[in-house]
C-alpha cells in the first residue's frame, strides 16, 4: 500500500500528456449533449421536489460499472460502507434501509424491509443494463408509500428498438478482474424486447476479498392497441463475495476480528471460555440470490384518463458463511465439532407477491387527480444452523394514496397528497407447533409540493411532508421474544426549499436547503441482558446541496456539486453528533471530446466521518478516476478505466482501505 513520489509524478505526466494531445488526435467536430447529472424538465421533475436523472449516455461516458458507481456522484447521496463490505446508499442522512429502490417499477431488495443487513448491495446491478436512473429526494410522491425517509431510486432498464442487435463487452484488469456482458434487443411494429446477461469477477486487492456476480434482466413489451401495452419483465442476480479482515490505517496490518461468536455453541467438548475467546474469520456470502418477475398492463383510453396494473413475485436468499479459527490460527477452539463447525452458515430467506393499481384523471384543464392502492406480502424465515434455531413470519402491507395536481397558471404547480399504510407482522419461533404472535401498525401522511417559475430562467420550489418508518419484522420478532412491545413507527417530517437558475441552454445552477425532524426514532437499547428496539430518540438533520453544470462547447462539458449535512441525535436530554456521516462531500466531472476519442475525468472529495463525540473515524480525502473511450467505427469501441488515478491512500470506513491505482481495459461491440 506504499505510495512513491516518483510513481505519482510519472503517472501525472502521462495523464496530462494524454489530455493535452487529445485535441490534435482527430479533427472532426460533433455536437454532443452535456454529460452531467441532469434534472430533466420531464419525467421525475413532475414530482416538484429535488430530483436527479442520469441517462444511459452519461453512464457510458463516465465509465460507470454498476449502480453504486452511478449513485456515488449525485448530490445528497453517500455510498455508505455497510456491513460485510456491501455498498448501500444513504440519502440526506437517512439510514441505508430507509431508501426505496425500484427496477422497472418493481420493488428491489425486499429483504431490507425484514431486517437491515447487507442484503441491498447496489453494486450487484451492472450499469450496462440501465437506460436511466432517477433519484427523488425530499417529500416524495405519495404513490411510493410512506415508509421511506431518504428517498426513492427508480432504475429503468434498456428497451429494444429497431432491428435485433447483439451488444457485447469484454474487459479485464487489475486484481485478476474480468467483466463480461452480452445483450440482445430489438423491436418490430407491436413488440419490443431486451435481454442482458453479465458476469463479473475480481480477486480483490486484500486477502479474502473475492467478488463474483452474475446478473440477468429481461423485458418484452406488447403493444396491445394504439393506447395500451402489456409488459413482462424481471431480473435475477447471484453473488458470491468474501469479506476481508479489517486493516489498521496506522500500521497497514490486518486486525484479528473481535467477534461475533454466534457460530460457536457450548457443549460437546466446547467450554464457555472457548466460546467467549473464539474469534471468527473468512466471512463469505455464498448463495446470495435475488429474483423478481412482473406483469404490467397500462392503458390511456383517452386524453383525460389513464391507468396501470402490475403484479410481481419476489424471491430473496441471503446465505452468510463464516469460518471458525483454530488455536494455531489465532483462535481458541481445540477442534471442530457439530457445535463449532469449521464453516458455519446462517441464512435469511424471503419470498412474496405484490399487486398495485394506479390511475389518474384530468377532471378539468387545471387539475389532475391521481389515486392508487397496493398490497404486498412477504414470507420470511431464518435458519441458525449451529443451534437449530429457526424463526419465520410474514410482513403484509396495504396502502392507498390520493393526490391532486393543480396548475392555476402556466408558471405555478401545486400538488397535495395523502397516503395511508397498514402493516401486519406475524412471527413464530423454532417450530410449526408454536403459535404465531402478531403486531399491527399504521401511518397516515400528508405531502405538499409547490413550484413557481419566477422568470423563464428561475424556478423556486417548496415541499413539506411526513413519512413513517416501520420496524423490520425480524427485529419486531426479537422484541416479542424478549417480552417487550414492538416500537411505534418512526415519524419523520421533511422540508425543503430550492432554487434553480438556467444560464440560457448551456448552463444550470441548483441550490437546495433541506431539513428533517425525526420523532420516535427507533434505536437499540439494553435492558439488563436484553438488547431490544425502542422509541427513545430524536434526530435533527440539516443540509445544503449545490450543483452546477455547463456545456462550454460542443467538445467540452462539466459538472460540480457540493453537499453539507449536519445531523444530531437527541437522547435522554443529551445531544450528540450522528455518527458515520461525512459532513461535506464534493464531486466534479469534466468531459472532453475530439472526433472519435472521448476522455472523462471524475473527482470526489469527502471530509472525515465523525463519531458521536465529534472525533474523526477516518481521514478526509480527494480521489479521481479517468475514463478514455475510442470509437474507430460505430459498432466498435475501446475503453480504459483508471480508478484512483493519483493513488490516494484513504479508507471507506475504519478498517476498509480503498484500492490503490487500478485499471480496467476492454472492448464494446455491436452486431
Q: Where does each model-flagged region fall?
A:
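N-terminal Sec signal peptide and the immediately downstream disordered periplasmic leader
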Residues: 1-74, 221-226, 293, 300, ...
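Conserved C-terminal beta-signal and adjacent last beta-strands/turns
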Residues: 27, 223-224, 404, 462, ...
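Acidic, small-polar-rich N-terminal luminal/periplasmic segments of exported/outer-membrane proteins
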Residues: 32-163, 497
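Transmembrane beta-barrel wall of Gram-negative outer-membrane proteins
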Residues: 172-201, 206-247, 254, 283-306, ...
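Membrane-embedded beta-barrel scaffold of Gram-negative outer-membrane proteins
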Residues: 191, 304-324, 377, 451-453, ...
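Flexible loop and strand-edge segments within Gram-negative outer membrane beta-barrel domains
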Residues: 202, 229-295, 300, 315-349, ...
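Structural signature of Gram-negative outer-membrane beta-barrels, strongest in the C-terminal barrel
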Residues: 362-370, 374, 391-517, 551-554, ...
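Gram-negative outer-membrane beta-barrel transporters
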Residues: 409-414, 514-517, 535-613, 629-638, ...
Amino acid at each position: 500500500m506504499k505510495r512513491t513520489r516518483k510513481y505519482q509524478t510519472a503517472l501525472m505526466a502521462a495523464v496530462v500528456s494524454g489530455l493535452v494531445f487529445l485535441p490534435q488526435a482527430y479533427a472532426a467536430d460533433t455536437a454532443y449533449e452535456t454529460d452531467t447529472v441532469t434534472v430533466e424538465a420531464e419525467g421525475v421533475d413532475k414530482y416538484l421536489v429535488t430530483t436527479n436523472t442520469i441517462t444511459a449516455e452519461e453512464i457510458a461516458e463516465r465509465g460507470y460499472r454498476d449502480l453504486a458507481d452511478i449513485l456515488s456522484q449525485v448530490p445528497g447521496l453517500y455510498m455508505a460502507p455497510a456491513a460485510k463490505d456491501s455498498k448501500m446508499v444513504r440519502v440526506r442522512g437517512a439510514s441505508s434501509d430507509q431508501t426505496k429502490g425500484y427496477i422497472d417499477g418493481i420493488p428491489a431488495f425486499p429483504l431490507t424491509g425484514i431486517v437491515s443487513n447487507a442484503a441491498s448491495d447496489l453494486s450487484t446491478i451492472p450499469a450496462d443494463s440501465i437506460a436511466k436512473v432517477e433519484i427523488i429526494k425530499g417529500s416524495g410522491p405519495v404513490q411510493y408509500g410512506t415508509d421511506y425517509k431518504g428517498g426513492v431510486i427508480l432504475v429503468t432498464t434498456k428497451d429494444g428498438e429497431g432491428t435485433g442487435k447483439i451488444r457485447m463487452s469484454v474487459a479485464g484488469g487489475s486484481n485478476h478482474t474480468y467483466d463480461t456482458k452480452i445483450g440482445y434487443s430489438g423491436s418490430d411494429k407491436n413488440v419490443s424486447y431486451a435481454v442482458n446477461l453479465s458476469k463479473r469477477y475480481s480477486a480483490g486487492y486484500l486477502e479474502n476479498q473475492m467478488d463474483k456476480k452474475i446478473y440477468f434482466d429481461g423485458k418484452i413489451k406488447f403493444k396491445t392497441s394504439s393506447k395500451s401495452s402489456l409488459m413482462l419483465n424481471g431480473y435475477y442476480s447471484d453473488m458470491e463475495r468474501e469479506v476481508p479482515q479489517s486493516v489498521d490505517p496506522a500500521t497497514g496490518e490486518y486486525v484479528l476480528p473481535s467477534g461475533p461468536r454466534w457460530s460457536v455453541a457450548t457443549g460437546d467438548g466446547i467450554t464457555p471460555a472457548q466460546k467467549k475467546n473464539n474469534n471468527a474469520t473468512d466471512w463469505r456470502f455464498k448463495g446470495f440470490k435475488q429474483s423478481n418477475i412482473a406483469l404490467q398492463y397500462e392503458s390511456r383510453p383517452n386524453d383525460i384518463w389513464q391507468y396501470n396494473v402490475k403484479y410481481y413475485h419476489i424471491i430473496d436468499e441471503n446465505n452468510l458463511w463464516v469460518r471458525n479459527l483454530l488455536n494455531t490460527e489465532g483462535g481458541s477452539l481445540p477442534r471442530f465439532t457439530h457445535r463449532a463447525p469449521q464453516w458455519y452458515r446462517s441464512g435469511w430467506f424471503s419470498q412474496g407477491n405484490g399487486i398495485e393499481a394506479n390511475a389518474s384523471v384530468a377532471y378539468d384543464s387545471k387539475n389532475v387527480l391521481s389515486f392508487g392502492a397496493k398490497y404486498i406480502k412477504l414470507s420470511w424465515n431464518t435458519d441458525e444452523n449451529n443451534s437449530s434455531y429457526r424463526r419465520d413470519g410474514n410482513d403484509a402491507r396495504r396502502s392507498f394514496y390520493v393526490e391532486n395536481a393543480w396548475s392555476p397558471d402556466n408558471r405555478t404547480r401545486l400538488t397535495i397528497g395523502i397516503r395511508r399504510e397498514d402493516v401486519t407482522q406475524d412471527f413464530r419461533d423454532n417450530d410449526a407447533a408454536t403459535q404465531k404472535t402478531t403486531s399491527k401498525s399504521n401511518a397516515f401522511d400528508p405531502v405538499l409540493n409547490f413550484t413557481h417559475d419566477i422568470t423563464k430562467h428561475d424556478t423556486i420550489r417548496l415541499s413539506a411532508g411526513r413519512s413513517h418508518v416501520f420496524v423490520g419484522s425480524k427485529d419486531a420478532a426479537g422484541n416479542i421474544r424478549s417480552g417487550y412491545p414492538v416500537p411505534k413507527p418512526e415519524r419523520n417530517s421533511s422540508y425543503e426549499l430550492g432554487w434553480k437558475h438556467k444560464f440560457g441552454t448551456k448552463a444550470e445552477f441548483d441550490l437546495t436547503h433541506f431539513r428533517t425532524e425525526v420523532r420516535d426514532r427507533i434505536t437499540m437499547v439494553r435492558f439488563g441482558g436484553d438488547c431490544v428496539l425502542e422509541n427513545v430518540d430524536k434526530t435533527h438533520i440539516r443540509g445544503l446541496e449545490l450543483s452546477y453544470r455547463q456545456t462550454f462547447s460542443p467538445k467540452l462539458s462539466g459538472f460540480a456539486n457540493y453537499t453539507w449535512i449536519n445531523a444530531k441525535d437527541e437522547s435522554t436530554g443529551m445531544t450528540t453528533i450522528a455518527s458515520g456521516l461525512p459532513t461535506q462531500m464534493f464531486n466534479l466531472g469534466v468531459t472532453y471530446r475530439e472526433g472519435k476519442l472521448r476522455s472523462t475525468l471524475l473527482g470526489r472529495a469527502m471530509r472525515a466521518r465523525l463519531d458521536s463525540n465529534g472525533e474523526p473515524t477516518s481521514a478526509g480525502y480527494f480521489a479521481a478516476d479517468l475514463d478514455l473511450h475510442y470509437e474507430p467505427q460505430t459498432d466498435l469501441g475501446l475503453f480504459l478505466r483508471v480508478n484512483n488515478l493519483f493513488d490516494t491512500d484513504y479508507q471507506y470506513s475504519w478498517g476498509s482501505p480503498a484500492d490503490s491505482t487500478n485499471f480496467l481495459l476492454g472492448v464494446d461491440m455491436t452486431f
